[in-house]
Amino acid sequence: MQKMKYSSQYKQLVLDLSWTSLEGLPKDNRWVKLGDSLPWDKIEQIYNNRLNNKHGGAGNKSARIIIGALLIKHKMNLSDRETIQAISENPYMQYMLGLSEFTPRPVFDPSLFVTIRKRLGEEAFNDMSESLLKLEVKQAEEKAREQKEQENDDSDEKHGSNVATSVTDQQSPQQEGTSHQGILKVDATCSDAEMRFPTDLDLLHDGVEIVDRVITRLCKINKLPLPNTHLKEIHSKYLNVIKLRSKPKKKIKACMDYLLTKLYRNIVTFLNMAGKESNTLFNTLKPHDRQLFMTVLKMYHQQKDMFVKGVHQCDHRIVSIFQPHVRPIVRGKAKAKVEFGGKIGASIVKGYTFIDHHSWEAYNECDDLMRHLRNYKKRFGYLPKKFEGDKIYMNRTNRRILRLLKIEIGGKPLGRPSKDQLTKEYQMEMAKNVGERNEIEATFGTGKRVYNANDIRAKLPDTGKSWTAACYFAKNVMKFLRGLLHDLFGTLLFLMERGFNLVMFEFQNLLVAKNLIL
């Protein structure tokens, strides 16, 4: 029997890359919609104000390219290099960045992301989010005005005027002339830094390795004899304890005593070399090495003091030698009682998140009340009508301030419950306040789970703050697009009520719903 000749059915496809113009891209793509909808002029103005290069320096990249790349990075949870690679492979992303033609070349070097994070802080991202919120309010006002004009042409002019007036009042409260408008919701959380869980043994062992590395580099640069730091012996003793399944306290304490002794010996060796030979030997090291050594020296004093006193806490405790600005933040949550990162105080206005306070040190968020109120008035020109926050915000001092400012307090009053608080209407009102306040808890969950706000990979204090702010700015941009989608469906319902044929409506614009929700 003759065997059949096998031939593969899968042929290599040939890509036709003859097209270069991006004008013919479909408008229902989410990146195309982003490029057509965002207020790039306002964003470019905010970005250029942070450059401080009006009178000198090379020309900068377009703000649309920079901010658009940041949005892609945090929306897709990509690294700096992968973001540039994804943009080079995707014409829709290049359209959002404002490019007129497709190009496979990188739009800029990935190292520029670090410079951008150093330039832009949480204030810049808050200003951009504010511009999105004001644009959404402006679009809602224009939509209400168009509906009012359309309804005025109908026979039922009186009913249409009342409806349009109510819509306009809801969307543009500042026109009413009152000094209190809107609801301000505040809360605090912790943005975790990407770092190893700190233990005393790990910190001391890292300190020994860093001092040995600094001594080796100092001797190599200045051609000095290399002293014996006993690194292999120290590493062996450390592994004998750290690899134990159950670590007795006596062995941990003995290992800490040993590491403290050896670390002190190596520090003294380095100081003798840098001081006796010449006063300028220390400056021959790189700034990063000098900073690491000073951090190890400070960490040694903290660990030695806690070891002698038999305690496990101290002020400004270092938990990472490579990120000395990170502090332990006591949270008391079920998942983790202590988190390591920056503590942020955020406020929410109409679904948009603003970071009003970012600190690497632990602080009491109840002291941020006036900060939130000042920022709210600075952004919108009036104080909030209602303030909602956790119990920690509702102490006697803050309640007194809110009463003096004539701001409604959303929450239960202090003291024992009165008879009025036992009524069904009161309980329903309190349940409503709790539901409204849960929005900011959901915002933190979305920011951490979707936009990686709990995995800050930037290693510097300023870049870490910028990373956190960029995560919530990306969330605000998605909120802006969902608002556009809501307006499209609102327009559809309005046209259906007025008797328009659905076929005449631009139904293709509604197909963007799937992409906007992602």
What is each PLM-predicted segment?
Residues 290-295, 300-310, 428-518:
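Basic, amphipathic alpha-helical segments enriched in Lys/Arg and hydrophobic/aromatic residues
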Residues 72, 219, 368-386:
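Short, basic/hydrophobic alpha-helical segments
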Residues 29, 69, 83-87, 109-113, ...:
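Short, conserved catalytic/metal-binding motifs centered on acidic residues
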Residues 28-71, 422:
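Basic, short loop/linker segments at the boundary and entry of helix-turn-helix/winged-helix-like folds
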Residues 100, 104-323:
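Active-site- or DNA-interface-adjacent structural scaffold in DNA-acting proteins
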Residues 1-40, 154-165, 486-518:
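Charged, often Cys/His-bearing segments associated with DNA-binding zinc-finger transcription factors
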Residues 333-379:
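Electropositive, glycine- and tryptophan-enriched low-complexity nucleic-acid-binding patches
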Residues 57-61, 91, 388-396, 415-416:
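Acidic, metal-coordinating catalytic cores used for nucleic-acid/nucleotide bond scission
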